[in-house]
Amino acid sequence: MMRRSRVSGGLAASCLCLAAVPAAGEVTVNLPAPTTPALGEIVAGTVPTVFRIGVDGSVTRISGDAVRLSNAPVTPPTMRLTCGLLNLANLCVVRNIRITMTPQSSGTVASVTMFHIGAISGTSFVGGAPADASTMNFQLTPMGLGVVTIQFGVDITVAPGQRGATVTRYTVNADFV
């Protein structure tokens, strides 16, 4: 039996938890507040512009000509995983967890184009930390009864001609393997 939690998070977007709860244990994914991280105001560029939000909260323009009006760092996104209290011996304590992170570009002027995984606490990666990717798919060792915290950064591509507050969305799924 697999347990799946699905959470949408965003940069200046709302976090939404969509979880079907079977009668087994569960993994709950908590993402940052709706404004974490927020790039702030952007002045329009003439070509697509990529901003990198590092796992430390630093913001760097990698390409393009849009301008971020603030030089301040942002709060880096942090994912927290917790396990429900039912059937822990069969699931949370002994089963690996697969995490899938996917950008959602529909209805936004900016999109997440790359995920960067940083520090992890409470468990470890199966097979080592994942490489940066546009869609992230990796496994964690069993988390037991504790809380797992994963810091990550993102690359955000802002479309040409866009200005104002930048909104992006992404989805995180957690499944027992």
Label for each model-derived stretch:
Residues M1-L11:
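Bacterial N-terminal signal peptides that target proteins for export
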Residues V7, I99-M101, G107, G122, ...:
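Intrinsically disordered/low-complexity terminal segments and short unstructured peptides
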Residues A19-A20:
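N-terminal signal peptide c-region/cleavage motif recognized by signal peptidases
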Residues A23-S106, N137-V177:
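N-terminal small/polar-rich segments of proteins
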Residues V112-I120:
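Short, surface-exposed beta-strand/strand-loop-strand elements in extracellular ectodomains
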Residues G122-T141:
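Extended, solvent-exposed segments with strong compositional bias
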